Amino acid sequence: MVTNSEDPKRTAYTLSVDANSPLTTTGISAHDRALTCRTLAAPNAAPEDLRRPGHIFPLRAREGGVRERGGHTEAAVEFCRLAGKRPVAVIAEMVVDGEEVAGQAMRTEPGMMRRDGCLAFGKQWGLKVCTIEALVKYVETRESKLHVNGNGSA
């Protein structure tokens, strides 16, 4: 795990990895990334099954799930847990290109798609979308609230 993460969202990054397999080439292709994700998710995965550095950045969810930290990582693992599956998930960011700048090879405000953009995308394409806030509310309705002490730990 990254010992001194300066991430303002407190995302628990680990070391980047690729699958240590004869089927892995550079690690960057969709095939290689999918193989790495399957390797990471395998119940019997061992450190020697992975090589470092790589192109996949594993994240660790907090033990208290979305009740402890309302992040994408915890939400993905929470959905797995609620479905009765192993607490292993793959997440990806949706991105926006921004608007073209006339006469220039650049765009304004490209970056990660935010909440409202994701909700609009889901509506446009008929996809089910759930906000982290709604997931927290659902979990707290079904289970007890997680009590956090004054220093931010459970």
List where the protein language model places each region.
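Catalytic domains of riboflavin
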Residues: 1-154
